[in-house]
Amino acid sequence: MAAPAVSGLSRQVRCFSTSVVRPFAKLVRPPVQVYGIEGRYATALYSAASKQNKLEQVEKELLRVAQILKEPKVAASVLNPYVKRSIKVKSLNDITAKERFSPLTTNLINLLAENGRLSNTQGVVSAFSTMMSVHRGEVPCTVTSASPLEEATLSELKTVLKSFLSQGQVLKLEAKTDPSILGGMIVRIGEKYVDMSVKTKIQKLGRAMREIV
């Protein structure tokens, strides 16, 4: 019984992707494929926005949508499963009009509301952000240390990490702190992972000592 529902969703998403661009236009594939319901909506939106050269504008609007939906008053209304769908659509129309969102973003929100998928909005925003990050050639990198790193250390670290990037790629560094690692750092860049924490070194030492005994 699930197949017709999935098929119906696919048709609706395809209709959305072509509703704001010329008919029969070829689908623009995003630079990375995101699976699931959120990925389908995000892919359709990416295709439509790309054809209108409004990727950056839509990205900013989606981040604003995510911010608005986190407001307690708005969330209690449009994300409440007991509130009638027509009321949700009316509330969202008021919001999109006030924010002056583009037809692309407005159509997406309306489609999510009509399909009862507003709870997936944050996932759609996240999927679209992932596509845009790859579109810009950004390589995500997370550096975790026991205490905040000094600016000089961060600057030197960035220089080293950038040397591993390919031409056209941009380093997107995020620094985090986790006192539990005791010292050193953990670096994750793209699909690579390097654990140089004191905690891990102690654990390795403990295992080595047990093997000797």
Curated annotation (Swiss-Prot):
The modification N6-succinyllysine is found at residues 90, 158, 162, 199. GO terms for molecular function: ATP hydrolysis activity; estradiol binding; protein-containing complex binding; proton-transporting ATP synthase activity, rotational mechanism. GO terms for cellular component: cell surface; mitochondrial inner membrane; mitochondrion; nucleus; plasma membrane; proton-transporting ATP synthase complex. The gene is ATP5PO. Keywords: Acetylation, ATP synthesis, Disease variant, Hydrogen ion transport, Ion transport, Membrane, Mitochondrion, Mitochondrion inner membrane, Primary mitochondrial disease, Transit peptide, Transport, Ubl conjugation. Its main location: mitochondrion. It comes from the Eukaryota. Subunit OSCP, of the mitochondrial membrane ATP synthase complex (F(1)F(0) ATP synthase or Complex V) that produces ATP from ADP in the presence of a proton gradient across the membrane which is generated by electron transport complexes of the respiratory chain. ATP synthase complex consist of a soluble F(1) head domain - the catalytic core - and a membrane F(1) domain - the membrane proton channel. These two domains are linked by a central stalk rotating inside the F(1) region and a stationary peripheral stalk. Acetylation at Lys-162 decreases ATP production. Deacetylated by SIRT3. In response to mitochondrial stress, the precursor protein is ubiquitinated by the SIFI complex in the cytoplasm before mitochondrial import, leading to its degradation. Within the SIFI complex, UBR4 initiates ubiquitin chain that are further elongated or branched by KCMF1. InterPro entries: ATP_synth_OSCP/delta_N_sf, ATPase_OSCP/d_CS, ATPase_OSCP/dsu. Disulfide bonds: none annotated. Belongs to the ATPase delta chain family. NCBIfam families: ATP_synt_delta. It is linked to Mitochondrial complex V deficiency, nuclear type 7: An autosomal recessive, severe, mitochondrial disorder apparent soon after birth. It is characterized by multisystemic features that include hypotonia, developmental delay, progressive epileptic encephalopathy, progressive cerebral atrophy, white matter abnormalities on brain imaging, and hypertrophic cardiomyopathy in some patients. Death in infancy or early childhood may occur. This is ATP synthase peripheral stalk subunit OSCP, mitochondrial. Component of the ATP synthase complex composed at least of ATP5F1A/subunit alpha, ATP5F1B/subunit beta, ATP5MC1/subunit c (homooctomer), MT-ATP6/subunit a, MT-ATP8/subunit 8, ATP5ME/subunit e, ATP5MF/subunit f, ATP5MG/subunit g, ATP5MK/subunit k, ATP5MJ/subunit j, ATP5F1C/subunit gamma, ATP5F1D/subunit delta, ATP5F1E/subunit epsilon, ATP5PF/subunit F6, ATP5PB/subunit b, ATP5PD/subunit d, ATP5PO/subunit OSCP. It is found in: Mitochondrion; Mitochondrion inner membrane. One of its GO terms (biological process) is cellular response to cytokine stimulus. Residues 1-23 form a transit peptide. A motif (SIFI-degron) lies at residues 5-23. HAMAP family: ATP_synth_delta_bact.
